[in-house]
Design a protein with these regions (language model features):
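Active-site nucleophile loop of the alpha/beta-hydrolase fold
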Residues: 120-126
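Short beta-strand immediately N-terminal to the catalytic nucleophile in serine-hydrolase-like folds
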Residues: 97-99, 122
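Catalytic nucleophile-loop/oxyanion-hole region of alpha/beta-hydrolase
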Residues: 63-91
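Gly/Ala-rich beta-loop-alpha elbow adjacent to hydrolase catalytic centers
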Residues: 99-107
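N-terminal cap/lid segment of alpha/beta-hydrolase-fold proteins
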Residues: 1-21
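Conserved alpha/beta-hydrolase
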Residues: 47-66
Length: 126
């Protein structure tokens, strides 16, 4: 069994984890309520085995951001996701979305003008 590469970083001021070996393809993973970026590891095991990387972020009031002042409000989170996505575009020509619950909804709002290759939405709030 091989160990999946895992790198903690900050992207556009947002704590993130990048899973997998260097690739031209990536999934942006946005967790749901009470989730965190680390929960993406299970999905990353499958995606990385297929040649993808997974970039998972922490939403405000979650994970590494639990004790920070930012709030989980659409008008705050949507620009954050847009900023993360803008920094992803020069690095990965193929970007897909994996969103869970409220994270799926927030990502859909943030990226509605973008041409995502594919979106996997788990229990999206609609």
């Amino acid at each position: 069994m091989t160990t999946m590469k895992k790198q903690e970083l900050t992207l556009a001021g947002v704590p993130a984890i990048l899973y997998g070996e260097r690739s031209r393809k990536v999934y942006l993973y946005v967790h749901g309520k009470n989730g965190c970026k680390e929960e993406a590891e299970r999905f990353a095991n499958t995606a990385c085995a297929a040649g993808w990387q997974v970039l998972a972020i922490d939403l405000p009031e979650h994970g590494a951001r639990k004790d920070r002042p930012e709030q989980l409000l659409p008008w705050a989170v949507v620009p954050e996701i847009q900023a993360v996505y803008a920094r992803m575009q020069p690095v990965w020509p193929h970007i897909r979305l994996y969103g869970v619950s409220i994270g799926a909804w927030l990502a859909m709002q943030a990226l509605r003008a973008e041409k995502l290759e594919k979106a996997l939405l788990v229990s999206p709030v609609v």
